[in-house]
């Protein structure tokens, strides 16, 4: 007996390939099983599906982000700082710049759903509008996160919010000061976050959309492109699953100049800070100087640096390289690879470089994709987070024993050289052991994308069967006859009828009252009975005395 096939709509808007690739990798499995995959995004981002030919149709649900706006946004994010008023203000401004696309996305998604009638929505965690339309149309939904979601599933042993921790990831070995620091972060940052909350409420009110109720557990599927070993283990409900690292089965091979460079060196440091990070000249010069010192001391013999055009654009390339070992070159000459120990490019086939035996260390911004790839290919890291979840990822890497963490505000050339020497010389045995351990865990975890596809199908079929009418069956019948039912009202768009049972993966506690959940009524009854027994006992004792 074959299972019914569904139409799945993937939604990625302000996120890039780091956000879309894990979702589309899972969808490639679903497409192979016969499901139809559509993709919704902002104008100008259609290229996100270029490597995924199974995507049937691309829908535009919002305006393009101009190159100028995009650069301005990431320059703002590159100043990320949790500990200053200006830094917190910039963080909130960046979040609001992303969220400003919510009205366009909300209206665009409603139109796409009305015209195409998907059976399931699979969205990136940035797309708040997907949650709203799924609630409105009663659609099953999955969300992909790079880490545990914030403001959900709190644990007593985890202080603070995931993604916002700066000092400690758990309370296990943390001082009382560090625990208080993490636990009070939102309180100390309240003025900035309240501004965002009020702004968001006003934006939703303008569209006539009520605030979504906040739950301690999600009422939809949550996947994380991460794995335990990086993430702190915690109790999670059946709707939440770490399924990472999600990686493509194939990747671009080495060729041309980069292949020649890698094959003619034995101890290469790969340097890459991602597509969106914009490094200022001070940081770039300190990294160059630190790497030059490492080359001079013989710890490494070559550097492959994928330096984005945006970061290059911040530099005066006519000046001499501010390093004792490279002062005979200008920045422009160094970027043109006129020193045989250095290879610069705006893009390199990162996974192929990491997989090569010559690559022995990775200097990275600790972005989710880069970290997953580095662990999977067994390369230790010097991790320097620049913004967002990169900051806490460096803490996780340090705890896992596969990286030395540097602070973007305080590091210098000497600290970078020391970090490289620590990994490759001083603590080499410890790092090799931990890298091997994490690599093997990641290799097993990379198979979980098939499990994620299974869970999506399971949730889809449960959702379809827990109402009076099966939409998948109705669609199958209408396709054989005269077409699916048309409706102008969103509530009637999917004629499911009455809800007969709850989600089978949802734990019952979220549907229970606080009194029943905590057995307050049972405790109250117990104390009443205890009081009655005590009163009867006392009364009987008094009667005996008489």
From Swiss-Prot:
Name of the protein this chain belongs to: UDP-glycosyltransferase FPY2
EC number: 2.4.1.-
A GO cellular-component term linked to this record: membrane
Gene3D superfamilies cross-referenced by the UniProt entry: Glycogen Phosphorylase B
Membrane topology: Single-pass membrane protein
Cellular compartments annotated: Membrane
Keyword Nucleotide-binding attached: no
Source species of the chain: Fusarium mangiferae
Similarity comment text for this entry: Belongs to the glycosyltransferase 28 family.
Classification of source organism: Eukaryota, Fungi, Dikarya, Ascomycota, Pezizomycotina
Enzyme class: transferase
Ranges that cross the membrane: 517-537
